[in-house]
Swiss-Prot record:
Organism: Homo sapiens
Protein name: E3 ubiquitin-protein ligase RNFT2
GO annotation, cellular component aspect: membrane
MF terms in GO: ubiquitin protein ligase activity; zinc ion binding
Organism placement in taxonomy: Eukaryota, Metazoa, Chordata, Craniata, Vertebrata
Biased composition (Basic residues): 107-121
Length: 444
């Protein structure tokens, strides 16, 4: 019985409570809901997002009229009218305001700090506006990123453009200079061709060792002598041979092109003399000078030639720097001569060091290995790997490879490693031992 009575009492209380809540006005019901939400989030950091279902149509009518302040809760309200495009943002309420609403239970609207309104002709939502601004800034940054070309690139383009415009005039100037000095250019080309032919032919004869041709060597000597005498005789009025013995040629004025002409002729003549001396060494028979020792003489002759060739232009450059005109500044000429002498002294010291090393190598005997026994020659196949013939005076290196003495000496005049295993065999000067002559043009 008592359970039945309690059940009836509970049903009556439930019906009464439901009737009371149904009769509450909408404004009070809404205020109680906001009060309960504020009491849950006392910090006010995370406000609930509520969309007003019963808001009047005038809420999204634009900015033509004044908006009522009591129609927005202290939260973020996003909405759009039928036309689309009206957006309102309300900043979150502070802690004090949230607490006040929780205590009082009534809702007090706070004036929004930021109010963004986009008309229907501009867009549909705030997110599109923010995204568009972000894309706009990124596009502007992307446009500025490539920027203008680097200064070096722009300068290079300017130089190329200038060359394109000035190239015809440069070619005209070069053509004029070549026509003015056509005789000197032709003589220099002819002497350079003669030197290249004689140098390559001599190296070929040196590589033949005892099989060299004496007739070819005599032809080289005659060819070089004929070219030298022809040039000196043709320009005998200038007395170009005086520069070979450090005397002044017969020229009224010495300009830059005359200086190059005299220095060039003297340098080619000295090269011809160097090749002629090497031809005499090649022509010597084996009884007088062994093949393995000829490379040392080639080296000494070349070093002495380069030293003498570097000394010949000195007096010519002194004369050109000081000049014959008395109006020239002696102070400037003296300074330039001192600078030239300093630079030239370093070059001469290097040449003297090369001559000293070559003479030291000439006076010392060079042993590339020891005599090989018959058993070692048999193990090596009785055939030299260089000349592909039977061993003659075989030598065995530290790497246990056997070669002919002459073949090995000729090989090590060009290289410093074993022909088979490429291990280092010697560590001495090997330049110019093959009979070659330097093609360097000694201008200064």
């Amino acid at each position: 019985m008592w359970l039945f009575t309690v059940n009836q009492v509970l049903r009556k209380m439930q019906r009464r409570h439901s009737s009371n809540t149904d009769n509450i006005p909408p404004e009070r019901n809404r205020s109680q809901a906001l009060s309960s939400e504020a009491s849950v989030d006392e910090g006010g950091v995370f406000e609930s997002l509520k969309a007003e279902a019963a808001s009047p149509p005038a809420l999204f009518s634009g900015l033509s009229g004044s908006l009522p302040t009591s129609s927005f809760p202290s939260s973020l309200v996003l909405g759009s009218s039928a036309g689309g495009g009206d957006v309102f943002i309300q900043m979150p309420a502070s802690r004090e305001e949230g607490g006040g609403r929780g205590e009082g239970g009534a809702y007090h609207h706070r004036q929004p700090h930021h109010h963004f309104h986009h008309g229907g002709h501009r867009g549909g939502s705030l997110l599109q506006h923010v995204g568009g601004d972000h894309r706009g800034h990124s596009e502007e940054g992307g446009d500025e990123q490539p920027g203008t070309p680097a200064p070096a690139l722009s300068e290079l383009k300017a130089v190329i453009c200038w060359l394109q415009k000035g190239l015809p005039f440069i070619l005209i100037l070069l053509a004029k200079l070549c026509f003015q000095h056509k005789l000197g250019i032709a003589v220099c080309i002819g002497m350079a061709s003669t030197f290249a032919y004689a140098n390559s032919t001599l190296r070929e004869q040196v590589s033949l060792k005892e099989k060299r041709s004496v007739l070819v060597i005599l032809w080289i000597l005659a060819f070089l002598a004929g070219n030298t005498l022809y040039v000196l005789y043709t320009f005998s009025s200038q007395q170009l041979y005086n520069s070979l013995i450090f005397l002044k040629p017969n020229l009224e004025m010495l300009d830059f092109f005359d200086l190059l002409w005299i220095v060039g002729i003297a340098d080619f003549v000295l090269k011809y003399i160097t090749i002629a001396l090497k031809c005499l060494i090649v022509a010597l028979p084996k009884i007088i000078l062994a093949v393995k020792s000829k490379g040392k003489f080639y080296l000494v002759i070349e070093e002495l030639s380069q030293l003498f060739r570097s000394l010949v232009p000195i007096q010519l450059w002194y004369k050109y720097i000081m000049g014959d005109d008395s109006s020239n500044s002696y102070f400037l000429g003296g300074v330039l001569i001192v600078l030239y002498s300093l630079c030239k002294s370093f070059d001469i010291c290097g040449r003297v060091g090369g001559v000293r090393k070559a003479l030291k190598l000439l006076c010392t005997s060079q042993n590339y290995g020891v005599r090989a026994t018959g058993q070692q020659c048999t193990e090596a196949g009785d055939i030299c790997a260089i000349c592909q013939a039977e061993f003659r005076e075989p030598l065995i290196l530290l790497c246990q490879h056997v070669f002919c003495e002459e073949c090995l000496c000729l090989w090590l005049d060009r290289e410093r490693t074993c022909p088979l295993c490429r291990s280092v065999a010697v560590d001495t000067l090997r330049c110019w031992k093959d009979g070659a002559t330097s093609a360097h043009f000694q201008v200064y």
